[in-house]
Regions:
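Iron-sulfur cluster-binding electron-transfer modules in prokaryotic oxidoreductases
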Residues: 1-248
Length: 248
């Protein structure tokens, strides 16, 4: 490719779901990239900013920029974190490095489709799969269409999954509904968050999904907790795990 590519691993993925980070790295390497992992990287600052501590998050944002300033592309398995870097670093002085990093950061599926032009993932996954696109990816990054705008196409993640051999993508009643997580929202409005999550899971189960997949592990973490408590017959997998052939 001839460009420097870095992997940005969200803090919750690093601590709770390292297999998603490994799958993302292996997937990018399968497509011929020499991917670097800057050891100085840390949280993008989204949790603090979402809690109302936006100015307190500036030091974290500056650290993020320093870690990734030398790269042409910064790829992450999280639409939510990518959205934060692209759209919520406005309080930083807009230096060349800040502007460069904000423009270089990509959600994984968007990078595969829009930059690498991946058409055939080259793997099989013979399961019934429900697709969940997180709100920041869907309505923030515009990586999938929204029903309130009369749009029905599935976006970049669904486009990739449709080319996976043996997969059956289930049609949901509410294909673009929020899972209810919302970071701090799941703490401050726990009952509402849990109800929204249960509705989301039940939509997938009702249509026979064996697996719920998403580009955001934060959404899947929320749904997985509900699935376990309710003993529901479905599991969650990050889209990187499917596209990498990690799970079959």
């Amino acid at each position: 490719m001839g460009h420097r590519v870095a992997l940005f691993v969200p803090c919750y993925v690093d601590q709770l779901y390292p297999q998603v980070a490994r799958a993302t790295l292996e997937l990018l390497e399968r497509h011929g990239l020499d991917v670097e992992f800057p050891p100085a990287q840390t949280c993008c600052g989204q949790p603090m900013a979402n809690a109302g501590c936006e100015r307190d998050a500036l030091a974290t944002a500056r650290t993020f920029v320093r870690a990734f300033a030398g790269y042409d592309f910064v790829v992450s398995p999280s639409g939510s974190c990518v959205y934060h870097v692209r759209h919520h670093y406005d309080l930083l002085e807009q230096t060349d490095d800040v502007r460069r990093v904000r423009g270089a950061v990509y959600e994984l599926c968007q990078f595969l489709v829009d930059v690498l032009n991946v058409d055939d993932p080259g793997i099989a996954f013979p399961h019934r799969v429900g697709v969940h696109v997180g709100c920041h990816a869907q309505r923030g990054l515009r990586l999938a269409e929204s029903s309130e705008l009369g749009e029905t196409s599935g976006g970049v993640m669904r486009r990739l999954l449709e080319r996976v051999r043996g997969i059956e993508l289930v049609e949901l009643d509410r294909f673009d509904e929020c899972c209810g997580f919302g970071g701090v929202f799941s703490v401050t409005e726990a009952a509402v968050s849990a109800r929204m999550g249960l509705d989301r899971v039940q939509d997938h189960v009702r249509h026979g999904a064996d697996v719920i997949t998403s580009g955001d592990m934060s959404c899947l973490m929320h749904l997985e907790g509900i699935i376990r408590r309710q003993h529901l017959p479905v599991r969650v997998l990050h889209v990187a795990e499917i596209l990498n052939g990690t799970e079959a």
